[in-house]
Amino acid sequence: KNGAEIVPVYSGSQTLVDAVSECMRYWVSNCDNTHMCVGSTVGPNIFVKICGWSTSQISRELKLQLKSKFKRIPKKIKLINCVGGGSSAYGFWSDFIDYDKKQIELIGVEAGGPQKSKLHAAPLTNDAKLGILHGAAAYVCQDAEGQINNTESISAGLDYPGVSPLH
């Protein structure tokens, strides 16, 4: 039969961080016959590079479209995107990161959690500390002992307790 086998995650809070953890756990236990690819710029450097490179096509295309429409990159433009795992933000911004901030302003929007919850998944706006998550140093929501906090978000893809090491 064709198609992927979908394996639900029943560990932890059953969110994206747990799915990535289970994926990595399976991969390291089956390295001889398995390869893994993560759809976000998280985890060990090679996965960040693979995902970052593939999503950067979005930025290259945006640059082409801007030049086609305006004959150049506009003198003042804002590029806004959700930040979290990092793939869409990096993909959208990668060709513009080195531009002067006065010309191109990059705006990242972080999803929080439910208003009554203290489990907000917004590491950049909630004083996250540098930590290690999925084999990468990044800003992570963690407790005083360095343990990863549970997080919540209205969006399943934005409940990751850290940000991409690219951020």
Language model feature labels by segment:
Residues 1, 82-93, 116-118:
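Short glycine/serine/threonine-rich phosphate/pyrophosphate-binding segments
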Residues 68-79:
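Inter-helical turn/loop segments and adjacent helix faces that build the functional surface
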Residues 17-46, 70-72, 98-101, 108-167:
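Active-site/ligand-binding loops adjacent to catalytic centers
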Residues 5, 103-105:
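Residues at the starts of beta-strands that form the adenosine-phosphate
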Residues 23, 62, 79-81, 86, ...:
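Buried hydrophobic positions in well-ordered alpha/beta secondary-structure cores of metabolic enzymes
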Residues 2-16:
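A glycine-rich helix N-cap at a beta->alpha junction
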Residues 55-70:
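Phosphate/ATP-binding catalytic cores across multiple sugar-kinase/actin-like superfamilies
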Residues 12-20, 51-59, 85, 89, ...:
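Generic structural signal for well-ordered, non-membrane alpha-helical segments
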